[in-house]
C-alpha cells in the first residue's frame, strides 16, 4: 500500500540506483524485453534480501544466451493524443543553446557569475500544432560458443517520446469575519516534454560442470527537455473586482544516466553445499544545469 517512490529495482538480485532524488525505483521500460527471462515482484522482504525498508521490490532476471544464433528487432511508432487528438499546442525552446554547466561547475567557487554565462535558448520559445511522432526501437543479438559453454547477449534500445499533460492547482482562504471559503489563487499548468533515452546492455555467461559465472553490464542515458506554461489568477477577497494574472514559463533540461556492472558466480561444491557470490559496481547521475523562469504579471 506504500507509494511507488518507496519501491526499488533489482537486476539479477542486485539493486540498481535511481538518478531521481525523489524516487528509488527506475522505469522498467529502459530494459529490453528481449533480454528479460522473468519478472519477480515482492511486497515484503525475504531472508535473502538486504535489510532495506521498501514498499515493494521488482527483480528483473536476465536470461542466458540462446542455444543458437539469434537476432531480434522491434520498432513501434505512435503519438500522444494530448496533442494529436485534443489539438493542444506543443511548446519547444532552442535546444542547441542551453547552458551545459553552471558557472560554479565551469569556473569554480570563486568565480562571479555574469549574465553572459547563461544561454538564451530556454527563453526562445516556439509553438507547434503537433510534435513529431513517438518512436521506440530495439535490437538484440545472442549466440553460444565453445560447445555451448560460453553465451553472449547484446542489446540496444532507443526511445524518442513527446508527451504532454495539464494540471490545475488552487489555494483557499477564509474571509475575515465570515465563514465562507474562497479561492485566493488558481493555477492552470500545461506541460510539453521531450524524452530521448538510449541504452546498451550486455550479458556473458560461462557454464562449466558444477559452476556458472554471469557478467551483466548496462548503461542508460536519458535527456529530458520540458516547457511548463503556468497561468495563474490571484485575488485577496471574495467578490473583489481587483485581481492579478500571471503568466509564467519554466524551461528546463535534465540529463540522467545509469551505469551498472555485476559479476556473479554460483558453485555447487557438493550435493548439499552451494556457494554463490557477486561483485557489483553501479552509479547513477542526474544533472539539471539549466532551469529558467520567465514571469509576466498583468
Language model feature labels by segment:
Residues 14-43, 89-93:
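Short acidic/polar hinge/loop motifs at secondary-structure boundaries
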Amino acid at each position: 500500500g506504500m507509494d511507488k517512490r518507496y519501491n526499488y529495482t533489482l537486476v539479477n538480485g542486485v539493486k540498481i540506483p535511481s538518478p531521481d532524488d525523489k524516487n528509488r525505483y527506475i522505469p522498467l521500460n529502459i530494459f529490453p524485453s528481449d533480454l528479460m527471462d522473468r519478472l519477480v515482484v515482492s511486497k515484503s522482504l525475504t531472508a535473502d534480501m538486504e535489510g532495506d525498508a521498501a514498499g515493494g521490490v521488482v527483480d528483473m532476471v536476465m536470461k542466458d544466451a540462446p542455444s543458437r544464433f539469434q537476432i531480434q528487432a522491434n520498432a513501434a511508432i505512435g503519438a500522444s493524443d494530448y496533442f494529436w487528438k485534443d489539438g493542444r499546442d506543443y511548446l519547444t525552446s532552442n535546444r542547441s543553446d542551453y547552458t551545459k554547466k553552471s558557472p560554479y561547475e565551469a569556473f569554480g567557487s570563486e568565480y562571479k557569475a555574469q549574465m553572459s554565462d547563461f544561454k538564451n535558448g530556454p527563453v526562445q520559445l516556439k509553438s507547434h500544432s503537433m510534435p513529431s511522432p513517438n518512436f521506440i526501437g530495439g535490437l538484440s543479438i545472442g549466440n553460444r560458443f565453445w560447445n555451448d559453454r560460453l553465451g553472449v547477449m547484446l542489446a540496444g534500445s532507443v526511445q524518442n517520446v513527446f508527451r504532454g499533460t495539464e494540471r490545475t492547482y488552487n489555494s483557499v482562504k477564509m474571509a475575515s469575519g465570515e465563514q465562507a471559503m474562497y479561492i485566493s489563487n488558481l493555477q492552470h499548468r500545461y506541460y510539453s516534454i521531450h524524452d530521448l533515452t538510449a541504452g546498451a546492455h550486455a550479458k556473458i555467461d560461462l557454464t562449466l560442470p558444477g559452476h556458472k559465472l554471469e557478467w551483466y553490464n548496462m548503461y542508460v542515458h536519458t535527456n529530458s527537455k520540458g516547457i511548463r506554461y503556468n497561468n495563474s489568477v490571484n485575488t485577496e477577497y471574495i467578490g473583489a473586482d481587483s485581481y492579478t494574472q500571471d503568466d509564467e514559463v519554466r524551461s528546463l533540461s535534465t540529463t540522467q544516466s545509469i551505469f551498472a556492472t555485476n559479476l556473479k558466480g554460483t558453485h555447487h561444491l557438493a550435493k548439499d553445499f552451494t556457494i554463490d557470490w557477486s561483485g557489483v559496481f553501479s552509479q547513477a547521475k542526474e544533472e539539471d544545469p539549466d532551469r529558467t523562469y520567465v514571469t509576466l504579471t498583468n
